[in-house]
Amino acid sequence: MENSTPKKISESQIKNLALSGGGFYGFAVVGALKEIFDNYIDPNNIKTISGVSVGSIIATMLAIGYSIDEITKIMFEIDMDTLIKDSYFSYYTLWEKFGMYNADKLEQEIERIIRDKTHIKNCTFSQIEKNLIIVTTNLNYQRTRIFSKLETPTMIISKAVRMSISYPFIMVPVLFEGDLYGDGGETLNYPITLFDDDLDKTIGITFANHNENDDGTLKTRLPINNFYDYIVSLGLTMNRSSYISQISSKYLDRSIVIKINEDISSMQFNLDLKQKEYLFECGIKSVKQQIIKLINH
């Protein structure tokens, strides 16, 4: 049953926010945050924000001072499909650069969004007030790499975000300090685990689509009919395996699990406005249904 009378969560209760990877399900994250910040939590009380993949984009906007209404506007106006597919697909790019698209325009857009709010070109982690944590994967060492004010103060934020969103095979991985970096979800798709020492003051947002259980396992067989389906399935398998290995009841108890009941893939390009609005509403509805467990914790 939905919580019909919103009750604010006190400043002392919540100070950490963890946003999982989820591709185009990012619209649902924004909907969830809209409901949370409008009715339950003052966003100024959030001190540390961690994000993976699309979660890293939203986490960054929150950390540098965008309001949830501003973030909603940006997410609905930005053309992710065009920004990611900024070049013609060729097998040469996939073979030589390990991805279908360079996505340079997407990185430039992320940099513009950051610069517009901070008024700083190539803004680094040390130049913002909140503690922003961006999760990436070092492909050469096959391990998680964290970028934050504490660990990498001089790192350019837009570059770290570009690494974190480098979905396998779709986007070219990023060469940094001699190593290749890819989607953070390949090794850590839900960064709530970074808050083990402060879990009772943390809220995480993650997903379960119509074919998933809350723990990330699939309910039914996923069809693979062409090369693109195969690539997407391979990427989702890596993200799912990292998620399943990390999730447990103690994390689910601190999580809003957004239910996506329509047949919309997290990697479905060319979402129309109706689909974006549906995902946004899924986020709002899931918070209304689940926030009570966090209030009563």
Swiss-Prot record:
It is an enzyme of class 3 (hydrolase). A motif (GXGXXG) lies at residues 21-26. Residues 17-196 form the PNPLA domain. One of its GO terms (cellular component) is membrane. Keywords: Glycoprotein, Hydrolase, Lipid degradation, Lipid metabolism, Membrane, Transmembrane, Transmembrane helix. Glycans are attached at N122, N239. It comes from the Viruses. Its main location: membrane. Probable lipid hydrolase. This is Uncharacterized protein R571. It comes from Acanthamoeba polyphaga mimivirus (APMV).
